[in-house]
């Protein structure tokens, strides 16, 4: 249903509020560069610091600006199942093509708790759902066996797996037998995942190198292994630098240098440390992004 380069959009801020103007411009930027789909209000979009109404504003703005030209996947993760259902229903009413739901953070549910969380949500909304497993940020790891159980639910159609472990991809593909699409959630290993059965990548790097990420995915889907890996090698220094501090700190700094956004973050996120500025600027210049 969704494939290729799916950007995990940043949320532009101005004076500690959502910068709707620049958010709309980002949608146009990605459509022009060939990005295949947009994720609004996910981790890279600072969803953890957005209020309920701000999340809805971001989702609604992206949907309205995209005008059905590319799919919009709404980040609707909430720790409480009932709150997640409510937000997902609202995103569906706005016209989101799918919901993107991270595992609950901090509370560390059991595998059975994760199954019940997602199955209750899926039964309550008539919209495709993409699971999101990112244990490095949530302290909660959804195991392949749980993914396989959830894959039997008709509107749970995909998972963003951010461990970057090739064995994890292989386990999910084997256990689910094609009943769920897998998306790379780790830019550093995305090419290898794409060439090993992943349907696409939900990417931080695509915020700045949108055209190259889309091309890399296109080459992978065309089984051009050499071409895909060549672009991945070209992008590797950028991938690495975009994670020298917590996401989205480096990517927002890079986008500010590119003139795409103002670069403001919401506390407790702070601006990129000065010691990383020169290296990131050099990589952006090498890729002809600035």
Swiss-Prot record:
PROSITE patterns, per the entry: DHDPS_1 (PS00665), DHDPS_2 (PS00666)
E.C. no: 4.3.3.7
Catalytic activity: L-aspartate 4-semialdehyde + pyruvate = (2S,4S)-4-hydroxy-2,3,4,5-tetrahydrodipicolinate + H2O + H(+)
Pathway where it operates: Amino-acid biosynthesis; L-lysine biosynthesis via DAP pathway; (S)-tetrahydrodipicolinate from L-aspartate: step 3/4
Signal peptide: none
GO process terms (BP): diaminopimelate biosynthetic process; lysine biosynthetic process via diaminopimelate
Site (Part of a proton relay during catalysis): 43, 106
Keyword annotations from UniProtKB, A to Z: Amino-acid biosynthesis, Cytoplasm, Diaminopimelate biosynthesis, Lyase, Lysine biosynthesis, Schiff base
Binding annotation for pyruvate: 44, 202
Any GO MF annotation of the entry: 4-hydroxy-tetrahydrodipicolinate synthase activity
Pfam families, alphabetized: DHDPS
Primary location recorded for the protein, binned into one broad class: cytoplasm
Keyword Lyase listed: yes
Family stated for the protein in its record: Belongs to the DapA family.
The protein's name in its UniProt record: 4-hydroxy-tetrahydrodipicolinate synthase
Species per Swiss-Prot/TrEMBL record: Legionella pneumophila (strain Corby)
